[in-house]
């Protein structure tokens, strides 16, 4: 992987990630394909929304179908027939979200398989091996996603262990002679001094890109913005910056304003299946009875398949009848909305008009622009 930085506007960056499997224009949003599928979508449909890279889930793909089935096909690209780059998370977040059925040690994490209850062990070395078999274009280190809230002492211990696991991830990745990219993950909860230690330690180890982890886990938005404003300038300028698990459209806008290049989140797909649709002036809750006879399109400014062909009344009807097509059409729209938003942000940065774009984005939703505390 090669990262090219073209231009900046304030702290916002316009560039691209270059892989053997294709080019990803940044800032970029990555749809989530947890089980080797972006729910309800074929790879061609996902590509048609404008997505150039997707995310796969190491933990779930390890449990089902497993490494052996994956290797029979070649890798995850061959298994799911996605031709572009794939980023896989390390499995850490899923393991730590298991709560009481897992035990963290210095060596790794003991837990019970949520499918059948069998005892399983996952550590940095195993995570690197699974992601190698998946053929991930971007591999994420195995870390502990520090929960929120966490006091300073716990956050410090967690961050320090994640740094030790980062070195172990790096060592196993290198011993596998993996030619793809490896990203470090910055931890430290909402504490700036801990984030400083994490960034410094990861940069000393050396990675192809750096993710900001442990945000969007329940902390106030002001804390997320503050940490991004503090951390992003410390990440080497020639490396991509990835904000994990984020988020709402406004979170993408605010991340870009603070220097983030990459995002992923289940929100556009999950919300689509629940009838929660993102449009230029906010959100349409398609289950609301007011849409029963509405012949207008979902979003007059959207060029997606759904908006070009169907009315709000039809989408309301499909949802009321629990038709699978409704979830699919909603997903197509939400994914396209996110990609159109990213394309708009990229164009605004190119033209040096980002703050004008941001102001318009919020004004059209009747909201104020959040403060930006950067030099």
From Swiss-Prot:
Keywords for the protein's UniProt record, in alphabetical order: Glycosyltransferase, Metal-binding, Queuosine biosynthesis, Transferase, tRNA processing, Zinc
Pathway(s) the chain acts in: tRNA modification; tRNA-queuosine biosynthesis
Gene3D superfamilies named in the record: Queuine tRNA-ribosyltransferase-like
Active site, UniProt feature: 89 (proton acceptor), 264 (nucleophile)
One Pfam family, short name: TGT
Binding positions for Zn(2+) per the UniProt entry: 302, 304, 307, 333
A biological-process GO annotation: tRNA-guanine transglycosylation
Enzyme Commission (EC) number: 2.4.2.29
Keyword tRNA processing: yes
Keyword hit for Zinc: yes
Catalysed reaction equations from the record: 7-aminomethyl-7-carbaguanine + guanosine(34) in tRNA = 7-aminomethyl-7-carbaguanosine(34) in tRNA + guanine
Region RNA binding: start-end pairs: 245-251, 269-273
Enzyme's top EC category: transferase
Cofactor descriptive note: Binds 1 zinc ion per subunit.
Cofactor(s) needed by this chain: Zn(2+)
GO cellular component: cytosol
InterPro entries given in the database record: ArchSynthase1/Queuine_TRR, TGT, TGT-like_sf, tRNA_ribo_trans-like
Single GO MF annotation: tRNA-guanosine(34) queuine transglycosylase activity
Subunit and partners: Homodimer. Within each dimer, one monomer is responsible for RNA recognition and catalysis, while the other monomer binds to the replacement base PreQ1.
Described purpose of this protein according to its UniProt entry: Catalyzes the base-exchange of a guanine (G) residue with the queuine precursor 7-aminomethyl-7-deazaguanine (PreQ1) at position 34 (anticodon wobble position) in tRNAs with GU(N) anticodons (tRNA-Asp, -Asn, -His and -Tyr). Catalysis occurs through a double-displacement mechanism. The nucleophile active site attacks the C1' of nucleotide 34 to detach the guanine base from the RNA, forming a covalent enzyme-RNA intermediate. The proton acceptor active site deprotonates the incoming PreQ1, allowing a nucleophilic attack on the C1' of the ribose to form the product.
Family designation: Belongs to the queuine tRNA-ribosyltransferase family.
Name used for this protein in its record: Queuine tRNA-ribosyltransferase
Organism for this UniProt entry: Enterobacter sp. (strain 638)
């Amino acid at each position: 992987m090669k990262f090219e930085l073209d231009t900046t506007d304030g702290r916002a960056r316009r560039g691209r990630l270059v892989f053997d499997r294709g080019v990803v224009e940044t800032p970029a949003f990555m749809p989530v394909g947890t089980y080797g599928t972006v729910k309800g979508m074929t790879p061609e449909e996902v590509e048609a929304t404008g997505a150039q890279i997707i995310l796969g889930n190491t933990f779930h793909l390890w449990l089902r179908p497993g490494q052996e089935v994956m290797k029979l096909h070649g890798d995850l690209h061959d298994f799911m027939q996605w031709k572009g780059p794939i980023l896989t998370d390390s499995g850490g977040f899923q393991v730590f979200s298991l709560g009481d059925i897992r035990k963290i040690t210095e060596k790794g994490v003991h837990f019970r398989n949520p499918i059948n209850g069998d005892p399983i062990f996952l550590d940095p070395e195993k995570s690197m091996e699974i992601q190698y078999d998946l053929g991930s274009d971007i591999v994420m280190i195995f870390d502990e996603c520090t929960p929120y809230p966490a006091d300073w002492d716990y956050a410090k211990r967690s961050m320090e262990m994640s740094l030790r696991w980062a070195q172990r991830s790096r060592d196993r990745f290198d011993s596998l002679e993996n030619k793809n990219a490896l990203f470090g993950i910055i931890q430290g909860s909402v504490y700036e001094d801990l984030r400083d230690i994490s960034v410094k330690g990861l940069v000393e180890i050396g990675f192809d890109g750096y993710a900001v982890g442990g945000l969007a886990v329940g902390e106030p938005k002001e804390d997320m913005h503050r940490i991004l404003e503090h951390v992003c300038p410390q990440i080497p300028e020639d490396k991509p910056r990835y904000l994990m698990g984020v988020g709402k459209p406004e979170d993408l806008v605010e991340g870009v304003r603070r220097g983030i290049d990459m995002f992923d989140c289940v929100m556009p797909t999950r919300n689509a299946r629940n009838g929660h649709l993102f449009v230029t002036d906010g959100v349409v809750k398609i289950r609301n009875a007011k849409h029963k006879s509405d012949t207008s399109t979902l979003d007059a400014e959207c060029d997606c398949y759904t908006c070009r062909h169907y009315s709000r009344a039809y989408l309301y009807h499909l949802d009321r009848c629990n038709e699978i097509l409704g979830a699919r059409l909603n997903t197509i729209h939400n994914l396209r909305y996110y990609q159109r938003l990213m394309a708009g942000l990229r164009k605004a940065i190119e033209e040096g008009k980002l703050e004008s774009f941001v102001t318009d984005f919020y004004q059209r939703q009747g909201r104020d622009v959040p403060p930006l505390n950067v030099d």
